Amino acid sequence: MLPSLAQWLQTLSPEFGFLRVFQYLTFRAVMAALTALLMGLAAGPFVIRRLTELKIGQPIRGYGMDSHLSKSGTPTMGGALILLCIVIATLLWVDLSNRFVWIVLLVTLGFGAIGWVDDWRKVVNKDPEGMRSHEKYFWQSFIGLLAALYLVFSISENSNMRVLELFFSWVRSGFDLNLPPKAGLLLPFFKEISYPLGVLGFVILSYLVIVGASNAVNLTDGLDGLAIMPVVLVGSCLGIFAYVTGSAVYSKYLFFPHIPGAGELLIFCSAMSGAGLAFLWFNTHPAQVFMGDVGALALGAALGTVAVIVRQEIVLAIMGGVFVVEALSVMLQVSWFKFTKKRSGQGRRLFKMAPLHHHFEKSGWKETQVVVRFWIITMLLCLVGLSTLKLR
C-alpha cells in the first residue's frame, strides 16, 4: 500500500522525489520486519492480558512431562497476534498487485483458520481432541491442493489471465502439458538441473510440502520458543531465495530460475521474521503465551508455500531439518508401536517419547538445553541451505 501511495505522491510534485526509496525491495523488507516487530511488542502485553481474562489457557496432557504441568493455564492462541502483525506489515509495504504475495497470505490465513477452530474447541469448548484429525486433514488438503493447482500454472506465466489460459489449455489437451524447466524439482548444488515433474507431479509435491511443513511445525511447537526461532531463521533465508529468484540479474548470475514477482515475497518473509521475534519476546522460557495451532499450522504452511514458489522444496527440507526430524520421529514412533503390537501383542517404542524434543527431555536434558541446541542446529542447517546460492 505505501509503495503505491509513494508513487502517486511523486506524480503530484517533484518535492516527493525522496519517496523513490519505497521502490527498493531491501528498504521495504527492513521496514516490514520493523513494523511487524514493533507491532508485536506493543500489542503483546494487551493480547496476553486479554487471553488470560478470557481463560484461554493451554491444557497440559497428564501423560506428558511432569515438568510441564506448571504450564497449565498459560494463555494460548497467541499465534493470532503473529498472523495479525504479518498481514498488516505485509499489506503496508508490499506491492498489492503481486499475485504471489496474495496466494501466500491466503494459504497462511486459511491454515490459521483451521488452527483457530482446533484451538477453540480444545480450550473454550473443553474438547481434548479439538478438530477431528480427518476433518483437519480434509481442510488442509483442500487449501493445499487449491494453492498447488494455482501455483503450477502461475509460476509458468506472468499474469492471472495467462494462468487461466494455461489451465484451460491443460484441460483441453487431456491433462497433458509440458511445463518449463523452472517448474521442475530443482536439485541444490547443481547448475540449472531440474527434474521434470509435469502438472500432476508438481501439484502432488507442492501439496506434500505445504501440508507437511504445516504439520511439522505444529509438532515441533512443544517447548517454549522451540518452533518460533527456527521459523524466523528459515523464513529469513527463504526471503533471500525469493529476492534472488525474483531478480533477473541475480538469478542469471547464480543459475537460479527467474520467476518474475517472486521478489516481493521478501517483504512477507521479513514481516514473518519480525512478528516471530516479537512473539519470541513473550514465548521464551518461561513462556507467557503459546502460539497454539493457529500460529504453528499457519507459519508452517507459509514456509511451505514460499518454498514452492521460489522452487526450493529440497532446500526447505535442509534448512528446516529440525521440523523434518520432529515429524519423522512421530511417524516412526507410531508405526513401530503398531508394528510390534501386531507382531508380538505388545507395542514397543523407538523413542522414550515423541516428538523428538520430549525424548531428549526424558533423557535428562533441560528444556532450555533442548530449545537452544535445536536453534543452533537450525542455524547450521540454514547456513548449509544458503551455501546452495553459490555452490552450484
Curated annotation (Swiss-Prot):
CDD domains associated with the record: GT_MraY
A Gene Ontology biological process noted in the UniProt record is: cell division
Which cofactor does the UniProt annotation name? Mg(2+)
Give the GO cellular component terms, alphabetically: plasma membrane
Question: Catalysed reaction(s)?
Answer: UDP-N-acetyl-alpha-D-muramoyl-L-alanyl-gamma-D-glutamyl-meso-2,6-diaminopimeloyl-D-alanyl-D-alanine + di-trans,octa-cis-undecaprenyl phosphate = di-trans,octa-cis-undecaprenyl diphospho-N-acetyl-alpha-D-muramoyl-L-alanyl-D-glutamyl-meso-2,6-diaminopimeloyl-D-alanyl-D-alanine + UMP
Its primary localisation, in coarse terms, equals membrane
Provide the membrane topology annotation: Multi-pass membrane protein
Q: Which pathway does UniProt place it in?
A: Cell wall biogenesis; peptidoglycan biosynthesis
State which Enzyme Commission number(s) the record gives.
Answer: 2.7.8.13
Q: Which UniProt keywords apply?
A: Cell cycle, Cell division, Cell inner membrane, Cell membrane, Cell shape, Cell wall biogenesis/degradation, Magnesium, Membrane, Metal-binding, Peptidoglycan synthesis, Transferase, Transmembrane, Transmembrane helix
**Could you list the residue ranges that cross the membrane?**
28-48, 76-96, 100-120, 137-157, 193-213, 225-245, 262-282, 289-309, 314-334, 369-389
This entry's Gene Ontology molecular function terms read:
metal ion binding; phospho-N-acetylmuramoyl-pentapeptide-transferase activity; UDP-N-acetylmuramoyl-L-alanyl-D-glutamyl-meso-2,6-diaminopimelyl-D-alanyl-D-alanine:undecaprenyl-phosphate transferase activity
Any idea where this protein resides?
Cell inner membrane
Could you confirm whether the keyword Nucleotide-binding appears in this record? no
**Stated role:** Catalyzes the initial step of the lipid cycle reactions in the biosynthesis of the cell wall peptidoglycan: transfers peptidoglycan precursor phospho-MurNAc-pentapeptide from UDP-MurNAc-pentapeptide onto the lipid carrier undecaprenyl phosphate, yielding undecaprenyl-pyrophosphoryl-MurNAc-pentapeptide, known as lipid I.
Family listed: Belongs to the glycosyltransferase 4 family. MraY subfamily.
- Protein name listed in UniProt: Phospho-N-acetylmuramoyl-pentapeptide-transferase
Q: Which organism's genome codes for this protein?
A: Albidiferax ferrireducens (strain ATCC BAA-621 / DSM 15236 / T118) (Rhodoferax ferrireducens)
